[in-house]
A protein has these predicted regions:
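A C-terminal functional module that forms or caps the active site or interfaces directly
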Residues: 140-182, 187-192
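Regulatory input/activation interfaces that engage signals or partners
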Residues: 158, 178-180, 185-217
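Short glycine-/acidic-enriched loop or helix-start segments at secondary-structure transitions
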Residues: 18-21, 71-74, 91, 192-193
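Conserved acidic residues
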Residues: 59-61, 159-160
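Mid-sequence, gly/pro-rich, charge-dense loop/helix-turn segments that line enzyme active sites
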Residues: 70-157
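N-terminal short beta-loop-beta anion/metal-coordinating cradle
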Residues: 1-57, 74
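Conserved beta-strand elements of the Class I
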Residues: 6-10, 62, 80
């Protein structure tokens, strides 16, 4: 029988997992928390999270990893705990003509727990480290140019960063009735696909620091 865990920590990719320090992984291994991969992108990450929740019955889920900053309100190398996650790219059309599911008059799930284009994770908690409400935009495909970023901000001016898993993981947690915390490190400017410019190690160390605080390690 698989033991129950108090906290399920999930990370999308093996690359991000390997960027976690050995010390941090050892600390997690000495607790009743469990660290797992959830997979890359908005489809697999949601399905895998549902499977992991059924397998481990955690009291809470924490999604960690890297994201790209959309507008510079949060700096590269900083870790952010997000207040809300919003879906981008599911609906109709593209570019300036795109419509979200909500704009089309649909809900992504129509009955309790109702899931629309945006899922609240926690009431906004602004402080010196997080001076703005932190809305994460989950995209089916990451920005590849400044034009992509501009189009996303035109539709979602309150979004501060983009990822490809947060909304799917949040939906899985909503269905399971389990609270989700998303803490991800800003590794790069969204639209910059030159990984030589990315500061992944710094971003993941910042994530570790925040996770330790949340879990009381």
């Amino acid at each position: 029988m698989i033991p129950l865990v108090s906290s399920l920590l999930i990370v999308p990719t093996q690359f991000e997992l390997e960027c976690l320090s050995p010390t941090f992984r050892e600390e997690i291994g000495q607790t009743d928390c469990h660290l797992e991969l959830c997979g890359f992108g908005i489809v697999v990450s949601g399905l895998r999270t549902s499977h992991l929740i059924a397998q481990h019955s955690p009291k809470q889920v924490l999604l960690i990893g890297i994201v790209g900053t959309l507008d510079g309100r949060f700096s590269v190398g900083q870790a952010v705990q997000f207040d809300r996650v919003t879906c981008f790219g599911i609906g109709a059309g593209s570019g300036h003509l795109s419509l979200s599911a909500d704009e089309m008059g649909w809900r992504q799930w129509p009955t309790e727990p109702v899931i629309s284009d945006s899922i609240l994770l926690r009431e906004s908690s602004c402080d010196e480290q997080t001076p703005y409400p932190a809305n994460l935009l989950t995209c089916c495909s990451a920005s590849a140019s400044d034009q992509d970023v501009r189009l996303r901000l035109e539709k979602h001016p309150n979004a501060v960063a983009e990822d490809m898993e947060g909304f799917a993981v949040a939906a899985a947690c909503r269905f399971a009735g389990i609270p989700l915390t998303i803490i991800r490190g800003i590794s790069n400017r969204a639209g910059d696909r030159n990984k030589d410019n990315w500061r992944v190690s710094e971003a993941m160390l910042a994530v570790e620091k925040k996770i330790r605080k949340v879990l009381g390690l």
